[in-house]
Each structure stands twice: as C-alpha cells, then as structure tokens.
C-alpha cells in the first residue's frame, strides 16, 4: 500500500541528534534531504490502530497481528520503509550522475527552518531554557510503501492511516500536523520466479560451481554485533554468511511450506543442514579483510604496511577492509549511520516515555547505497535451486535486525552461476599465508569454544605433512546468533576474528590440489553455518598504504543548471542565487574598506534606513533629491561617494548589476560594513 504524507504544519521529526547550534535536529540523508524514520512511523501508526479498535469496538489482536506485540520478538505482518520525499527515487538517480553540485547545508535549508523557544517563568525567560529546533517546513510531501498488507485488513489499515493526524516531537504544541492519503494497490498475480520443487541432477553429473552475487543496501542495514555500550546496538561492517544462509533458509521454508517440519525436508537438509554448500561473508565490493599480519610504524603515519613479525619498532596493527593491487593496499571505509529511537511506556495516556517507564536506544547501521559481494560454492544443482530464490521480488529481500521497519531492505543483483574449472597452478613453496575470511571456532576437550592454535595445527597437518612452524597474527571475537525457531539467541562463543593470519612454514613444496582442498574445507567448527572460511593469499611485505578517495563533502561549482527534476532545479536556482548574493555582499564589504571613518555614523544610519524603506528605485531617487545641496550631500561628495551612492552604482562584473534589488542588496551590505567598522572603542579599551 502506497501512502503520501503531507505536512500541514512545521514538523519536528527529531532524530535524537544535536549540534552546537541545534538542540533537536531532524533526520536527513547524506545529500541533506529530510526523511521520517520507518520505526517511528510504525510506532505512531500502531497507536493509531489501537484508537481505531476502541472506536470500532474491535479486539486489539488485529493490531498485534499487523504490527507485532509489544515486548515480543515477532514483528508482525506489515513491513515499513522510511518516508522519503515524494519522487525521491528520481531525485536520487539524477543526483548520482551530477556529483556534489548541491551544498548539503543549503538542501537542508530548502526543506527545513530553524525556530527558537524558551520557557517563561515569572514574566521572564527561565535560565538556560532557550532551545533551538530544526523543523521540516509546512507543505512538504513524503511517500512510502507499506508491504505485506493482508487484503482482509486493507480497510482497517486505511482507517488507521486516516486517524493519524499528528506526528513527531511537541505535537501537542502545534507541531506535526499531517494529512495522509492511502493509495490502495490493485491485487495482481505475482510474476516472481518460483524455485523448483526438488533438486535435480542430470545423469548423476553434478559439477562443482559457484553462485556469485552483489548485495546493495536499499535501507540502513543493521547486522547486530556484541558491543558493551548500554542502549546502543552496533553493526558489523560486513554481511555475515550466517545472515545469507538464514535468508535462504527462510525462503525455502516459506516456498515449501515447511513451518515446524523443515528438518524433515530433503531439500532443506541438502542446502541448509548438510555441509555441502560453502556460505561466504559479503564484504564491501572489491575488498577483503586486511590480514592482521600487516601493521605500520606508529611514529610515521605515512609509513608502508609491513609484516609485524620480528619488528623492533613500535607498530600499529591494521584492520578493516582493503583492495590489494600493484604493491598497494587501499583501505575502504564502510559508511555507517546512527539512528535514535525511544519506546513508549505502557501508559498510553502519558503520550511519551516517562522517567520510570519507556527507554531510549541507538541503532548503528550500514548506510544505504553501498554494495557488497559474495559467493556460494557447492554443487551446480544445489546452487541452481537457490538462484531463482534470490531473484524473487526483483532480488529485493530483508535481512538483519528490525526487519519490519526502517532497517534490512537489500537488493541481490548480478547473480551469476558458473562451473568451477580446475586451474593448473605451480606448486607452492614455504611459507604460505592463510587469512581467515570469517570467524574460526575451535573447541577444547571439554567442548568449550576457545581460540587455540594447537587445534588449528592438528587440522593443518592432515594437509601439510611436513609442517615445521606456525606463526599467527590474530585477535579474538565473540559470536552470537539469533534462532528464529527458538525466538532466542544462541550461547556466546569465542573465536579467532576475521583477518587472523597464519604464516605456515614447511619442508619441500605443496601441490596446488592440497591447498585447494584445504581452502574449500576451511578450518574449525560450525563450518556449515558459514564459519571457518579461509583464503590462501600471496602476501608481500612493504605495501604502500592508501585511503579510498572520498570527496563527498567537496562541492562542485557549475554555471548552468544541470537538473531536469523540478525539485532539484528549484534547489539549484535558489542555491545559485544565494551564492551570487554572498559574492555581492563580500564585494560590498571589500569596497567599503576604502571609506572607513569617512562618513559619520548618523549619516550611514540615515542612508541605510532610507534604502531599506525604498521599495522602488524612484523612492530612493526622491530621497536623494531631498538631501541634494544639504550637509549630507557635501559629506558624501567630500568622501567621493556622492555619485556612487546617488546612482546606487554596482560593479559591472556583478550579475544584474543594473537591477534595483541587486543595487539595494549591495549598498545595504556596504553601509552595514561601514557602520560595523566605525564602532569606536570604550575608554577601557573594550
């Protein structure tokens, strides 16, 4: 169901963020365009649904079914997306092709306004009560789609939307009045491809293959990780194999109607429970985890990436993700964003979180419009079953935390299935380097997960018979998963972290076949879940370190409007006019410097007041006629300003220098600069 929301008054859709100048700010994207968070909207709509139930005499169960029950992990049937500006998809596509032409601060000003408020106490402003808010302007339209609306509840949801008339902070103080227009979708038959009902193998020939794909974040993506900060949920900077595996498992269960009996299904066993398919993490496109063997000299920020083994100088370890090429390591940053949320108390009459009830919390997420890539390795028939599942719904799926609102929407694209052809590679000499591409779990004799190099060595000697030495550069991580069937988290376990590097030394040479088998098998436990993935890399010492070029904050100046979208055209024209105005004022201030202390303050104030009140050039001409031949005329003439002031002359390199509005702006800035510079110091020197 598509909905259009229009602000009928200024809206404070507070993000929980503030700055030195703004106490409560709205939520906006990297371009400066405001949006309303889906999680916030869902909570408000749920409250409206309860009111509709009371009006119509319905049971609250319909609200719990649609929106989920408070305090329950079940998120309900409906799925919500952020409310973005109307036609934002077209706006975003045009912006992507035009670089950073628009100033982010000007975009904010185009859609928002700043207001100040204070508290009055005993007839005067209360101490420290001044607050400054950024508000979304009246008349701004937003739109979104509510997904998975049951046809039987369309009418109820429509009433719920129409009943919602105020949103945002301080909505009982005149802010946040809105109008919502639901657009009821026509029912249509889905054309999404359906996975085959069984896994076929022709003539028992089932070659090894890989299914590669890209995952692009359409909304903020939250892959929750264990982090010690209270009221904050942090995210991983990659998409774990466990989430990809869980998504595919969920689709198989749904398509084959396997609720509560999935473990008995042959297809589910083959793809999910057996260790026949290797699920890999999805890293930011073109990168891989930085091997922990690399570090750089702490005393020299521009030093090269060097092996940390046997270094005498102080080294700083490297981490994150990077692209390796041409003796260089290019670090890539995964962009994240923070969002503020609050949960209301059970007391609906309170209307907000109270001191004793409710809570506030922050979600960190991977920002939208970032592309990750991964691949699955397994038999061609198994992967051929998975391929149409990923293509369903145009490749758009939900994964991660808070899937029903704001977070989790991703798009699978560039999905390709190809057989793995055997490569004839030369034998490898000692040493070889193994870099962990996922957490690697090892169990001790009591079944407790403890990172243990000796356990890894026991596995490695089955492949490398003449192993002589293992050196390791590592850190540990704590892993935890969520089991939807159990509605609870799995026990926490310690593991070797991603990027952990093993330097393997041995006698003689190793056949490529052995290395390939070891890479395919992985190391450690729980490999069927996506853990234990490794990569054999040819690492070299002394790489040049570079950072990805991120010029997103550098504004590009262009003389002509490059946009066709009406909203972008309007913003560009206003920004250009404002830029021209700023240049005009700067030119006036610069020229005023030649006449400091040439005119008395009283005359400057008189000129400024008369020009301010003049709505037409003829009004100013009339004022000039009145002072002609008087003392003001002589003072201006002595300062060599009479001709310029009387004619309101503007430098000819200024756009529209002959128009009265331009002349007025220039000379008002000129007089203001003169007056400001002529303020004489007090006797005490201040």
Task: Please describe what each predicted stretch is.
Residues 1-686:
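Conserved active-site/ligand-binding neighborhood in enzyme cores
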């Amino acid at each position: 169901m598509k909905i259009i929301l229009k602000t009928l008054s200024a809206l404070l859709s507070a993000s929980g963020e503030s700055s030195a100048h703004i106490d409560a700010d709205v939520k906006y994207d990297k371009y400066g365009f405001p949006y309303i968070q889906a999680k916030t909207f869902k909570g408000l709509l749920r409250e409206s649904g309860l009111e509709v139930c009371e009006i119509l005499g319905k049971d609250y169960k319909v609200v719990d079914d649609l929106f989920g029950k408070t305090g329950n992990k079940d998120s309900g049937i409906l799925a919500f997306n952020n409310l973005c500006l109307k036609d934002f998809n077209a706006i975003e596509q045009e912006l992507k092709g035009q670089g950073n032409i628009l100033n982010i601060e000007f975009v904010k000003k185009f859609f928002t306004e700043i207001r100040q408020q204070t508290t009055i106490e005993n007839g005067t402003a209360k101490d420290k009560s001044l607050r400054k808010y950024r508000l979304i302007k009246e008349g701004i339209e937003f739109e979104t789609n509510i997904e998975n609306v049951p046809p039987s509840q369309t009418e109820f949801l429509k009433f719920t939307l129409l009943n919602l008339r105020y949103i945002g902070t301080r909505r009982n103080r005149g802010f946040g009045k809105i109008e919502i227009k639901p657009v009821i979708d026509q029912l249509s038959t889905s054309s999404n491809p359906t996975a085959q009902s069984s896994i076929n193998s022709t003539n028992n020939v089932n070659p090894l293959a890989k299914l590669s794909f890209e995952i692009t974040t359409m909304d903020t993506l939250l892959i929750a990780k264990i982090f010690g900060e209270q009221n904050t949920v942090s995210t991983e900077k990659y998409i774990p194999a466990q989430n990809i595996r869980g998504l595919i498992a969920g689709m198989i269960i749904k398509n084959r109607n396997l609720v509560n009996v999935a473990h008995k299904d042959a297809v589910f066993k083959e793809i999910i429970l057996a260790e026949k398919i290797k699920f890999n993490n999805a890293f930011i496109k073109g990168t891989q985890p930085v091997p922990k063997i690399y570090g750089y000299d702490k005393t020299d920020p521009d030093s090269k990436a060097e092996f940390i083994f046997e270094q005498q100088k102080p080294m700083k370890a490297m981490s994150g993700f990077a692209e390796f090429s041409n003796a260089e390591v290019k670090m890539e940053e995964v962009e994240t964003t923070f969002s503020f949320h609050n949960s209301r108390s059970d007391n609906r009459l309170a209307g907000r979180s109270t001191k004793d009830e409710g809570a506030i919390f922050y979600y960190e997420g991977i920002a939208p419009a970032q592309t990750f890539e991964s691949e699955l390795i397994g038999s061609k028939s198994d992967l051929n079953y998975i391929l149409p599942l990923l293509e369903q719904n145009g490749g758009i799926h939900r994964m991660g935390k808070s899937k029903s609102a704001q977070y989790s929407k991703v798009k699978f694209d560039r999905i390709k299935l190809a057989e793995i052809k055997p490569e004839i590679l030369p034998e490898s000499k000692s040493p070889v380097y193994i870099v962990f591409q996922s957490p690697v779990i090892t169990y001790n004799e009591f079944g407790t997960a403890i990172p243990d190099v000796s356990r890894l060595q026991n596995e490695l000697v089955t492949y490398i018979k003449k192993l002589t030495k293992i050196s390791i550069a590592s850190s540990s991580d704590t892993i935890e998963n969520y089991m939807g069937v159990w509605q609870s988290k799995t026990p926490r376990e310690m593991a070797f972290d991603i990027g952990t590097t093993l330097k393997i030394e041995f006698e003689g040479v190793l056949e490529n076949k052995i290395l390939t088998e070891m890479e395919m098998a992985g190391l450690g436990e729980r490999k069927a879940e996506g853990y234990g993935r490794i990569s054999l890399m040819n690492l070299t010492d002394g790489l040049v370190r570079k950072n990805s070029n991120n010029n997103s904050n550098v504004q590009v100046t262009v003389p002509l409007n490059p946009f066709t979208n009406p909203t972008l055209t309007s913003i560009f024209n206003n920004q250009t006019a404002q830029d021209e105005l700023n240049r005009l004022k700067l030119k006036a201030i610069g020229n005023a410097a030649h006449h400091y202390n040439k005119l008395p303050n009283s005359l400057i104030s008189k000129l400024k007041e008369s020009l301010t009140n003049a709505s037409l050039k003829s009004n100013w001409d009339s004022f000039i006629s009145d002072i002609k031949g008087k003392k003001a005329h002589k003072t201006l003439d002595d300062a060599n300003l009479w001709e310029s002031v009387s004619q309101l002359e503007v430098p000819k390199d200024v756009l529209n220098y002959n128009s009265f509005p331009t002349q007025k702006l220039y000379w008002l800035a000129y007089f203001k600069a003169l007056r400001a510079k002529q303020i004489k110091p007090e006797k005490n020197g201040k």
